[in-house]
Amino acid sequence: MQLNFLLFVFIFLMVFHLNIFNKGKRQNLVSAYLNHFKKSYFSGVTSGSDCVNKSEVSSDNNNNNNNNNNKIAHNFFSKKYQRNFENNNLSENQENNKNIIYSGSNIFKNIYNTEMMSNNNTVDVNMMDNNPAARLEELRTIMKKNKIDVYILINSDEHNSEIINEKDKKIVKITNYSGADGILIVTKDKPILYVNALYELQAMNELDQNLFTLRISRIDNRDEIFETISSLEFNTIAFDGKNTSVVFYEKLRKALLNAYPKKKIVEKIIYNNNFDDVNKKDDENVLNFLVLEKSLVEIKDYPVNNKTLYIHDRKYNGACAGEKIDKLKQSLMYDIKNVDNLLLSELDEIAYLLNLRGYDYQYSPLFYSYLLFQFDREEQDFSKIVFFTTVKNLPADVKNLLEINKVIVKEYEEIVPYLRDVVIPSIPKHNDDNPDFKKYDISLSPYINLMIYKLFDRKNVLLQNSPVVKMKAVKNDVEIDNMKQAHILDGLALLQFFHWCEQKRKTKELFNETEMSLRHKVDYFRSTKKNFIFPSFSTISASGPNAAVIHYECTDKTNATIKPAIYLLDSGGQYLHGTTDVTRTTHFGEPTAEEKRIYTLVLKGHLRLRKVIFASYTNSSALDFIARENLFNNFMDYNHGTGHGVGLTLNVHEGGCSIGPVGGAPLKKNMVLSNEPGYYMKDKFGVRIENMQYVISKEITDTTEYLSFDDLTMYPYEKKLLDFSLLTNQEIKELNEYHTTIRNTLLPLVKQSPQEYGESVEKYLIEITEPIAIHNN
């Protein structure tokens, strides 16, 4: 009787929930929600789990920021769009919001306040100023005043973030070069800007080469920059302490010692740009290394996040914070026995370990922080865990999580004084008599900033990746299931976008659109999907020649009108389920034979890597050749890696695994990587095809495990760009199988939500996944 009653209540609630969704005209996929309810929401979660923190397995609405059911997206997008969209089979609720457009240039306008900062010994850079010559001259005046001969500026921040915030975009303020990668060497002569080859065309377009010398960093000349600096004549060189990594610093230091073996390097930290106590006497036998607490280049105003952190629920990541901390403790107990202090400085590691997410970055749900672990060898436990962050951004449930896991909270700015005044004095002196066992004071990331690194004696610092890098690189089954769900949602958004493009192409209205309006459109379609947070990076929307710029970003200056030409879309989203990244190259006209040939050669490499079988001990760099071989055979190549790791609602580019021509390491089951070969013809067009895939175990023999990949991305390739004469029957078979999987996955969801998609989208999905005929010969 009781069971029957409970069953009745459950069915009633489900029907009621469905009616609420329909009557409320929500943009969620109702049927998908029902079909995936158990898998997406309860996989790996039990009320009787051994989690120390029950709030981590609670429903979404326990988070103060109310991240469930795409409310976050609507909070952003409902105020960001400033042009009208035509009605194209949108749901009624979407139609009501058709005046909404997402503005990618300032996604956090509603959650940021502006703070004015000032400093006497700095260049005051107004965000709207556009005079690099004047700014460069002002910087040189400050350098001359303080007897600084060489000043190094690096596009980075305190945490080695790939995509940095406005407060750290100092190179663009001096040079007008806006790429994510760059190292600027300022001297009394012509400054030198080094950029990664990915940004070569962008730098050539943006940089005034009458003012600056442009140098390109490639795979075969990565250390050239250190030779360049070593060749300069100087007595004093200065670095931004918070934006310079120890890896760069130590490589340069070594290069200078080799170039000038008779010179002595004198290092000094300069606090608050107070140069009064610096020895300014020119001594030809001394090289002064100044580590600046504050940069010589100051951004006068920049956005500051005031939005609170939230708990990333265990139903999405499969493990409590306490479980992850215990796993880290095991590493210190059994694997890392020569150090008792561990400082995490990489923000995705901290967010992953604590199951927290935030809003300090535009495209990654991270927050400024450090996390210090102090291990007691006698107790075999952590004596202290100290979390440095913006305390006012911690809501009650997050504070509760931290308290349960015995995490002490301190303000973000206290990290340097705490290490200097509390941690360092408490470290016992080590007996280094045993050459086989070197005891270190602290373990730091190789990319830790100089302000932290210089607090310690370098010989007592263990520079190595933390165990968390490997922990988060290997996803658990719950994470893989959620990543699949994120990519299904992503595939539906791409389907709507490319269907919209095709409808507009037929009426030629598409050719009144621009790269930027198409970027806004695809970002908008993603925003309608359940549990979407924001884009995972700045969407690359590139038409014609702009598609040849690998990391192209359309601006008001470069924004091109859409032409009947090749169009490359590289985009992704952050969902509570996971992070996505996908690239599709299409053509809005009739492709040439050359365009078809190159697209097909790129696709052949992509397909080979997609289903390759390899032994578990294989270095991932060996897989890179597989994606390039067809291009190599035609004397072609691409100047970027083939695959990068991807986080789960973390960074879209994640460490711990990669596929590239150099470096690499063996891959493990459940690692998630991209597969993205390409080819780029300057001033003509570019092609890139990118899927997300995860490592699967294919076979285990007596001696070896054999691995392969399975797809996460759920969107078909462009059949219009195929040169069928270059494809084998096996490749065509694989294409058909993949497209059938996409159809079988997305079509039921499209049919179940006619208000959101409609018959036209359904027909379009069937059309683009139609099987390709197998060759007769």
Curated annotation (Swiss-Prot):
Cited InterPro entries: Creatin/AminoP/Spt16_N (IPR029149), Creatinase/aminopeptidase-like (IPR036005), Creatinase_N (IPR000587), Pept_M24 (IPR000994), Pept_M24B (IPR033740), Peptidase_M24_C (IPR032416), Peptidase_M24B_aminopep-P_CS (IPR001131), X-Pro_aminopeptidase_P (IPR050422)
Record-listed Mn(2+) 2 binding positions: 570, 581, 690
GO biological process: hemoglobin catabolic process; proteolysis
Gene3D superfamilies xref list: Creatinase/methionine aminopeptidase superfamily, Creatinase/prolidase N-terminal domain
Keyword set, alphabetical order: Aminopeptidase, Cytoplasm, Hydrolase, Manganese, Metal-binding, Protease, Signal, Vacuole
TM region positions: none
Primary site of residence: other
Superkingdom, natural source: Eukaryota
Localization per record: Vacuole lumen; Cytoplasm
Cofactor dependency: Mn(2+)
Protein name per UniProt: Aminopeptidase P
Lineage: Eukaryota, Sar, Alveolata, Apicomplexa, Aconoidasida
Gene of this entry: APP
